[in-house]
């Protein structure tokens, strides 16, 4: 079974068993809603247990989560630095033109039907995501996720068609 990160427990919150979660999901309200089931993985990325969400609220830059059956700080302290994950069958449905990062990373990138590399990472520096393309014998290419650059994404065929605008490739 495949699991995908939704957040990391970075600390406890108060004495009543709440934890601070640094979320890495665009669907925090859905992932952390009461009754949701998440997998808890330890610091070495080994499955530890399944937890059920008892409550969720936002506080500053964190999601404050309480798990069913864990009602005291002593019950949750040991889970600091553990990761919360969701199974693939619980991923939210996306709109047309939206993708999960795991679907994009590893795809081949083409310009004018010439293979230029593979997506190795996706950065979120601001208004637009930036796709990092690993190229053989050249520096990585940074492509903003905008319509004038990313022309077509074909996940089933493992292909992305792009136009590298002037100034994006400093090796030309």
Swiss-Prot record:
Query: Gene Ontology cellular component?
Result: cytoplasm; ribosome
**Location relative to the cell:** Cytoplasm
- GO BP annotations, alphabetical order: ribosomal small subunit biogenesis; rRNA processing
One short Pfam name that applies is RimM
- Please state the protein's primary subcellular location: cytoplasm
InterPro entries, sorted = PRC-brl_dom, PRC_barrel-like_sf, RimM, RimM_N, RimM_N_sf, Transl_B-barrel_sf
Q: Kindly list the GO molecular function terms attached to this UniProt entry.
A: ribosome binding
Tell me the keywords, alphabetical order: Chaperone, Cytoplasm, Ribosome biogenesis, rRNA processing
Lineage top rank: taxon: Bacteria
Q: Which NCBIfam families match?
A: 16S_RimM
Q: What does this protein do?
A: An accessory protein needed during the final step in the assembly of 30S ribosomal subunit, possibly for assembly of the head region. Essential for efficient processing of 16S rRNA. May be needed both before and after RbfA during the maturation of 16S rRNA. It has affinity for free ribosomal 30S subunits but not for 70S ribosomes.
Xref: PANTHER family:
RIBOSOME MATURATION FACTOR RIMM
Quaternary structure (record): Binds ribosomal protein uS19.
The written remark on domains in the entry is:
The PRC barrel domain binds ribosomal protein uS19.
Q: What is this protein called?
A: Ribosome maturation factor RimM
């Amino acid at each position: 079974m495949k699991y995908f990160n939704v957040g990391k427990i970075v600390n406890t919150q108060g004495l009543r068993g709440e934890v601070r979660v640094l979320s890495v999901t665009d669907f925090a309200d859905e992932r952390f809603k009461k009754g949701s089931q998440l997998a808890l993985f330890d610091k070495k990325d080994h499955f530890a247990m399944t937890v059920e969400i008892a409550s969720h609220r936002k506080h500053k830059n964190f999601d404050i989560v309480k798990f069913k059956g864990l009602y005291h700080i002593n019950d949750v302290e040991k889970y600091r630095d553990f990761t919360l994950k969701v199974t693939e069958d619980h991923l939210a449905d996306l709109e047309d033109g939206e993708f999960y990062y795991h679907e994009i990373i590893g795809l081949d990138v083409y310009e004018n039907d010439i293979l230029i590399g593979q997506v190795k990472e996706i950065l979120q520096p601001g208004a637009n995501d930036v796709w990092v393309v690993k190229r053989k014998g050249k520096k990585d290419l940074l492509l903003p996720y905008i319509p004038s650059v990313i022309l077509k994404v074909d996940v089933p065929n493992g292909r992305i068609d792009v136009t590298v605008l002037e100034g994006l490739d400093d090796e030309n």
